[in-house]
A protein has these predicted regions:
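Exposed beta-sheet edge/beta-hairpin loop segments within beta-rich domains
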Residues: 186-191, 339-340, 383
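Active-site pocket scaffolds in enzymes
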Residues: 325-337, 344, 348-391, 395-397, ...
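Short beta-strand edge segments in extracellular beta-sheet folds
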Residues: 414-416
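Local beta-strand/beta-hairpin segments that build beta-sheet-rich folds
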Residues: 309-320, 364, 406-410
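Residue-level marker of beta-strand positions
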Residues: 46, 53-54, 197, 347, ...
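Conserved phosphate/anionic-ligand binding catalytic regions in large, soluble enzymes, centered on
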Residues: 120-127, 341, 346-350
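Active-site microenvironments in enzyme catalytic cores
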Residues: 6-37, 49, 55, 59-318, ...
Length: 421
């Protein structure tokens, strides 16, 4: 754990809303995003979230352009230096308060964008509880496939359909084969689901043909966002063999707009997942003593649901990245182990973050046992899977005694009716 004055829990900001209990964006956070003032003819540009305000980086002379890829490419040393300077500027003891007040934009007046241009997107399968739960529905006697505890499994996702929080999600159509049908049909998905995930935004990256050693892996991660990997389970069930997910996943993925840097998350590091007795140890390229000691991050992820009839969202689950079988450093090391090159702004998904308890399951597929036990919502409605008009809201939080509590904002999306019946 590498701490500095920016992590001091006693630190206060002259932006009063940043000092409020429960604030997602206290001065100890300082996440980066892309914004412009709503209704104004002006370019989108970089900003830093502080309380309920955005500090305009362009006004400070840091012109990122419409994405943060350039900042990510500079590496953690540069972003760490910038973070420390921003902390000094926004501190209650700052000598620049009067000047900086002019550079604040209220979040309510801002339009937020995807923070980076995403060239490539890989989605992993690090949540062992999710993998076991899903496998148990398909293979009750052998829920985990033999390779799971040896290799950080993943697949190549679709970058073009990644959208920022608040973007509506159209119910997809695809090939579905009902159990009693002789042939598949093309129809709107009736088993639309969410997946509670985190997304990790790549920093400088590596040259083609040059793997990133696990000991250096976190130097190539700019920060973390919330990620909802929408999934059409009925389409997925028919198409995924033998090559894995395709159209069941590629129609939409929702991200939160603020990138929380790894430096902000230092106080919430924890040990890697404790493997069961008899589990194999990681192969040498995935093994690092420091990573095993503190390569995990205790980032809590909550999923909330709001229906057209139920205006107050209800929490469906709360999981944590600390329950992932594989660490972030292992994900990066494995992704690049064959020489694959990561580029600034590339996205690595964690996979669904389910915990060991019923209230920590990160998908409706698990919560409802594939629709067999529908959820009963407070207003009396029932849900086996998502219905048109439902809004899913993902929230993230880091809390640890002796440190400030940080948030990630939201990754929200509302389901629109399918174009295909």
């Amino acid at each position: 754990m590498k701490l500095d004055p920016t992590h001091d829990p006693a630190l206060r900001s002259w932006v009063e809303s940043a000092n409020a209990p429960g604030c997602d964006f206290p001065i100890q956070n300082l996440p980066f995003g892309i914004f412009k003032r709503r209704g104004q003819r002006e370019p989108a540009r970089g900003g830093v979230a502080i309380g309920d305000q955005i500090l305009d980086l362009a006004a400070l002379g840091l012109r990122t352009g419409p994405t943060l890829n350039g900042l990510a490419a500079m590496g953690r040393r540069a972003s760490r230096k910038l973070r420390r300077e921003l902390s000094r500027m926004l501190s209650a003891k700052s000598r620049q308060i009067k000047r900086l007040q002019r550079f604040l934009v209220p979040m309510k007046q801002a339009e937020l964008y995807l923070p980076v241009s995403i060239g490539d997107y890989s989605d992993f399968f690090t949540g062992i509880h999710h993998a076991t739960n899903m496998g148990r529905m398909l293979r009750p006697d052998n829920p985990l496939l033999p390779n799971y505890k040896w290799v950080p499994i993943g697949y190549h996702g679709r970058g073009s359909s990644i959208v920022v929080s608040g973007t509506p999600v159209r119910r997809p159509a695809g090939q579905v084969k009902p159990p009693d049908a002789a042939a598949p049909l093309f129809t709107a998905s009736k088993r639309l689901d969410y997946e509670a995930e985190l997304g990790f935004v790549a920093g400088p990256g590596n040259r083609l043909g040059r793997p990133i050693p696990i000991r250096d892996a976190l130097e190539h991660v700019f920060g973390v966002v919330l990620l909802n990997d929408w999934s059409a389970r009925d389409v997925q069930g028919w198409e995924y063999q033998p090559l894995g997910p395709f159209l069941a996943k590629s129609f939409a993925t929702t991200l939160s707009p603020w990138i929380v840097t790894l430096d902000a998350l230092e106080p919430y590091r924890c040990a890697a997942f404790a493997r069961a007795a008899g589990d194999p140890g990681p192969l040498p390229y995935l093994q690092d003593e420091d990573d095993q000691r503190e390569g995990g991050f205790d980032i809590q992820v909550e999923m909330h649901l709001r229906s057209e009839k139920m205006k107050a969202p209800v929490r469906l689950s709360r999981g944590s990245f600390r329950d992932s079988y594989w660490t972030l450093a292992q994900m990066v090391a494995h992704q690049t182990s064959n020489g694959c090159n990561l580029q600034p702004g590339d996205l690595l998904g964690s996979g669904t973050l389910s915990g060991p308890t019923p209230d920590s399951l990160g998908s409706m597929m698990e919560l409802t046992l594939a629709g067999k036990q529908p959820l009963e919502l407070p207003g009396g409605e029932k849900r086996a899977f998502l219905e048109d008009g439902d809004e899913v809201i993902e929230r993230g939080r880091c809390a640890r005694e002796g440190y400030a509590t940080l948030g990630f904002g939201e990754a929200a999306g509302r389901i629109m009716p399918a174009l295909q019946k």
